[in-house]
Amino acid sequence: MRILGIETSCDETSAAVVEETGDAAKPWSIRSNIVASQVAIHREWGGVVPELASRQHIRDICGVVDRALSEAETAWEDLGAVAVTQGPGLVGSLLVGVSYATAAAAAAGLPLVAVHHLAGHIESLVLQNGELPLPSVVLVVSGGHTSLYLVEQPGSYQLLSRTRDDAAGEAYDKVAKLLGLGYPGGPVIDRLAKTGDDRAIALPTTRLTHADRNAPELKGDLDFSFSGLKTAVLRHVRDLESGAAPDEPRSRAPLPDKTIADIAASFQRVVVTALVERLFNAARRYQARSVGVAGGVSANSRLRADLKERGERREIPTFLPSLALSTDNAAMIAAAGLRRFRAGQIASLDLNADAALPLHDQRPT
């Protein structure tokens, strides 16, 4: 069976065709995966502008779907279902994908499958590597999310922890903007960090020991927090630029390249250490047989290297998506859609977007 996946949760318009392989160990194969990025549009504004994003999705969606079907050598009558990201994300962006998918499914007489965006990221690990040894602890880390999930059976995701404030990718973008490095910040900080001294600056690591009152069901000690780190970088930069107190006017004189590289390296070391430590602490606590990292920040070179090194030291298998599957894409949505379709989880054609959709609402029944 082949399924069409559609992803428009933020600023990438993507469509993909994924098919079942008949191999239980590696159940899915990508026939096409088309992504139209809006980075050039939003770079001018220093971040994603929701109104611009949704308008660009409208311009791109038909052509992207046509390209995905053409590259996959697949006609509408060859498809078994249509899968679409229902949420979470930017509501205007989500509505474009959901509206297209519901109309297409109705016109073609195909079942519609609603997919949670983070479930797609988790299933990107299976799409890339085959079924993971379970139970597995998966870190989903991106510009909008930083969470740990326990996967005890295929298609079931239990939230273990989350960020209390900024997502890791969001912190990267904010620090990059502070340093005048442009948007998106993750790739440029990763590149500059390779030339910097990651011990040049003493930056704080937040260690939480209490439960979040907004999520009392979580223990709290596995939660993340990056706002304090971001503020520490801000104070350090202001001191360097103006030689004044943090609340005094800052100088416009640019920082030396070496200083910026040292800040990038020190910041990245603290972020990656926090991510990897909590991931493996969770793996030990829940006796996981594997760990994985998914989402846009999983493309970070230091995170990939540290994950591999820690996994080898702990003698636990580690899994990552390819770089192409790290960022938002429709192939992962199609894969998650196939999982839900086989579980009998079909959506009605009056499906609506949900910008704050909880992942636990989409557990298998």
Label for each model-derived stretch:
Residues A114-V115, L307-I333:
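Conserved phosphate-binding/catalytic loops in two-lobed NTP-binding clefts
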